[in-house]
Amino acid sequence: MAVKSQLGVTYTTKTFPPSPPRTVGNSHAGSDDERDEVDATPTTPPVEKLGQLLKPYSLPPTNTPTHVLPEDLKTPDHRVNRDPRLIRLTGVHPFNVEPPLTDLYDEGFLNSENLHYVRNHGPVPHCPDDESLNWTFTVDGLVEKPFTIAVRDLIQKYDQFTYPVTLVCAGNRRKEQNVVRKSKGFSWGAAGLSTALWTGVPIGALLRMAKPKRAAKYVCFEGADKLPNGYYGTSVKLNWCMDENRGIMVAHKMNGQSLHPDHGKPVRIIIPGQIGGRSVKWLKKITITSEPSDNWYHIYDNRVLPTTISPDASANLPDVWKDEKYAIYDLNANSAICYPRHDERLVLATAPDTYKVRGYAYGGGGKRITRLEVTLNKGKSWLLAGIHYPEDDYRRAPDGDLLYGGSTDMWWRETCFCWCFWEIDIPVADLSAADDIMIRAMDEGMMVQPRDMYWSVLGMMNNPWFRVVIHKEDGALRFEHPTQPALMPGGWMERVKRRGGNLTNGFWGEKTAAEEEQVLAEPEKEICMTNPKVVRIISLEELKAHEGEMEPWFVVNGHVYNGTPYLDNHPGGATSIINAAAQDATEEFMTIHSENAKAMMPQYHIGTLNDAARKALEGSAEESPASDPTRAVFLQPKYWSKAILETKTDVSSDSKIFSFRLDHAAQSIGLPTGQHLLVRLRDPATREAVIRAYTPLSETHAKGQLDILIKIYRDVPGQPGGKMTQALDSIPLGHFVDIKGPVGKFEYLGKGHCTVSGTSRHVRRFVMICAGSGVTPIFQVLRAVTSDAQDGTECLVLDGNRCEKDILCREELDAMVARAPARTTLLHKLSRPDASWCGLRGRMDKEYLEEHIGGFRKSDGREMVLVCGPAALEETVRSVLVEMAWKPEDMLFF
């Protein structure tokens, strides 16, 4: 609409995209710090607000009322109001979300707080409203005048500015990379970006007050969000901060309101043109240094490593991660199609002559997007789209213009901080004749989006041509976007891959003439874990009625399973099922269990949770609701407990003892002899869990510390190493891991008495067979037997390794034998010994086992074989012992 300002200048208020036109109609422009909920219904603005509406630029949409969502109630973010439309990308917590792409685009140039994307690495730091102005942060390091400043002084003592900035996550469009090959990042769709008006102080004003010294080159930022690897922090160059064209700001308002907790309340950094990961939230420190930040998150996040480096290989390349040339700062040119929407149908009989294809584009480093091209024939020819730059409307603000208490003085600035919108009218007849629509953007530096994807280990900065497939169906055109965010199904990329298409062949997975003669590999089959005939709906109350030992039910992916029939047969013992009773066991089950185990699930499937029950379980805290750090026993069978990594001690070239500090020095571990515990680590970027079972070396009665011997399986050419062991080896001291237990079907009670799946046995002789780090459960039982002079149980230990230096716990094992030489025998056999080895040589094969173990003594019935080692060893032992007439119930595999 045309409006006339008090200066007599007529402006046209533009709303883009043109449909639906609600950006201005729902605007608010209050300059106070109140966070009152605003009625979403458009109303006539009060007289004092009209001055704000008579502007040459758009104002942000009004926030709709929000509240704490049910899924957040039992998380550390239980105080934070959120919009239910946001799509969660990493489960319930931490909060990483993007809005539906169409909703984001339809809001127009500026996005509401409701739909602004969020990237949180952990819990949101809590800052009460009445403490916001008292929040302080420091400015120190290589400066002459370090100081601490409160938000109140930041507002009162410095000039304020307001201007629009588009923030973009470096992972925007990562889902496309994850479909091609799983990266270490979680799956963002194409809506990992948002634009808002930010109010605050140019950072250069603070730095000039501090007076950087001559050696200063970098500015490090650190937030208040405490994470597994310390507080989140990163850095940028000092000269960028001092350059007003860069527009780097210390912000305290977003769209005229004080910052929302998810967006950094009460103060944060805003860095236009760079990836969102540099704009640190909940700011506590600004430190000027001579080198880039050494913060863990600066080094191991927001990088584009060479495409040749796999996720597994990256775990053991610290020097590569620390190489600053792989760090991401400026955004690259990128674009997406928003209309037609994913799965939108255009009925040809009623369609207009043309269809308006439209979307967004953005550049980085202040560069403007100067062209957007569209092709309907895979790049053989291109059409030029029209581009609209709403950001330029703010450059036309009159002198002295104030918005939300900040000057909009940006007429002089040529750098581009925001996304732009493009559109093109295409004849429907041309769309009907095409197989797809593809676009590419170019910035003013003549950098154009690439045709093909550059895959990298973190899946960041993905910006190949954006492609929408056109399907002809029943007199209509159906449009299919490349992916859908998170775990949402849909998109042509998943469809093509399921059918065996090669997404890296340069033709978007379509068969080329050269590939027609090739037989494609069998598409990966998804294991069905449900029974299609089961239609029962189960409530939370019904599920909770089965949280005991008698008839335990558990949940995987929203489906309910009855574990009762498998209690006696579960390899991990009945406790593994009982401990999961009436709980969502999805993460543990999917992480630990084999494909064979998953294929067995349909026979135990009894129903599906209703929506209320699903939400209730999703919101359940993972840790005990009464997880008292002063409790006497550390392990909790149903809940994860945190232990801090204190030391790593090398015991061989590829094995270490990891020592973890418990909650307090008098706290016992709580692990019965012969049982094990679960250790969980989460990838800091993806939040995906890695869970493995380990048997500690610690004494059963040990207190305050937990020692675990772990063999590190490293990557070798052609064979990836151990995901968990390499992850454990790479985490720094002071990092915590999650631990839960005990689990296991075997427990040694002393003097030959033990239980197997709850059944009591009295054993006269144990045959213990192990290899490598499989010695640890054997170690536990042998120590218990030999430590008790009154325990007459005989033990034969057969320990296999490659070479002499690989024999783990050798001195300790020898000491155990020395304590009870009459009833304990220990034999070492090496498969690759050197010339000095005088012991047994070769593999633990049939002849070796027959010679030293002998057949099962039927008249006795009190012998038992305990086995722990690689799968190949366990299979050999199993088959040989069966041939020697040993019964399956007398063989136990840890």
Swiss-Prot record:
Biased composition (Polar residues): 7-16
Sites where the protein binds FAD: 692-695, 709-713, 723-725, 773, 776
GO annotation terms (biological process): nitrate assimilation; nitric oxide biosynthetic process; sulfur compound metabolic process
Cofactor note (record): Binds 1 FAD.
Annotated Mo-molybdopterin binding sites: 169
Enzyme Commission number(s) of this protein: 1.7.1.3
Top-rank EC class of the record's enzyme: oxidoreductase
Quaternary structure and interacting proteins, as annotated: Homodimer.
Domain Cytochrome b5 heme-binding as annotated: residue spans: 535-610
Compositional bias ranges of the Basic and acidic residues kind: 69-79
Name of the protein described by the UniProt record: Nitrate reductase [NADPH]
Coiled coil: none
Binding-site positions, heme: 570, 593
UniProt entry tagged with the keyword Ribonucleoprotein: no
An example molecular function term from Gene Ontology annotations: nitrate reductase (NADPH) activity
Family: Belongs to the nitrate reductase family.
Listed cofactors: FAD; heme; Mo-molybdopterin
